Amino acid sequence: MKIHEYQGKEIFRKYGVPTPKGILAVSANDAEAAAKELGTSVVVVKAQIHAGGRGKGGGVKLAKSPAEAKELAKQMLGMKLKTIQTGPEGQTVHKVYIEEGLAIGQELYLGVTLDRATSRITFMASREGGVEIEEVAEKHPEKILRESVDPAVGFQDFQGRKLAFGLGLTGPTVNKFTQFCSALYRMFMDTDASLVEINPLVILKDGGVVALDAKVTFDENALYRHKDLLEYRDLAEEEPREIQAKEWDLAYIALDGNIGCMVNGAGLAMATMDTIKLVGGSPANFLDVGGGANKEKVTAAFKLILADPAVKAVLVNIFGGIMKCDVIAEGIIAAAKEVQLKVPLVVRLEGTNVEKGKELLSNSGLAITPADNLRQAAEKAVAAVK
């Protein structure tokens, strides 16, 4: 689950992670009032969306007066902000964060994430703060420092000092940076976060260390034990179909292709998408119906796929283990009739009750294209949209 910058900073402050003073605004008048309340000669007007790279997209602006803050907020609110992380469609700005200006001496990058290669929480830091870290990682990977945390002992002060020295920090700032990292680690662990990024992390001219940004993502599988964090969820920032999928306990992620996919099992779903790409197509979604789906769940999954106007064909790829192929077939037939299917449908079934499932599809009277294997199914789906 992603949250907004202002929400991330609220959590930071609870753990003693230094942040600038800021006030949320949902209108231009609110922005003007916030700038007056902060009382600094310069304020920063920041668009609040669930994506990074806002600065380059025009979502972070300096204002030297409350009137200017009002005008900038007026321009941002309601705009479609496009960044490297939003895709070409962009995201609508519904709120802005008005923050005090600071005397910045240096901009750095600091991130905490789960490193699957080491199975450990890992700190990443770079002197290249304030720019796209993805670009730095691609062009200059040597500029990113990494420090893995032993789960048995947690984050140690020497690791903070090691990162600080690698970033070129000196004097009292080294200890301030170390304390900053320790507090961030506690927050990461306590909230079951999966990613925390601060870009930029700034060193003030007086040597202070402050989080000028906050990008926080939580592990959705752990939210059952963090009811307080659910209050931060902003459904307006999430894909409507993904919200609907959660209601049916479906794993659904919208993509930008035109071939809808319904598969059971995450591994098979990824293999299906890879095969579609391999034969020249583009998947419209990732959708795993799980191993114990019933007819109603399959119907809901089918309707979810077809709710995407970009879908020009549907590929169903099911290996029936726990899930029986005849149950899948019944769900496909029910959904196709209910939504009045108008796009080509390719179905590949294998496993438990496969012959019964194929018989149901064959006798359904629907225009269903059968396939005997994954590659053949992908080729038929791609051919159907060309």
UniProtKB/Swiss-Prot annotation:
GO terms for biological process: succinyl-CoA metabolic process; tricarboxylic acid cycle. The keyword DNA damage does not apply. GO terms for molecular function: ATP binding; magnesium ion binding; succinate-CoA ligase (ADP-forming) activity; succinate-CoA ligase (GDP-forming) activity. Mg(2+) binds at N199, D213. It catalyses: succinate + ATP + CoA = succinyl-CoA + ADP + phosphate; GTP + succinate + CoA = succinyl-CoA + GDP + phosphate. ATP binds at K46, G53, R54, G55, E99, L102, E107. Heterotetramer of two alpha and two beta subunits. This is Succinate--CoA ligase [ADP-forming] subunit beta.
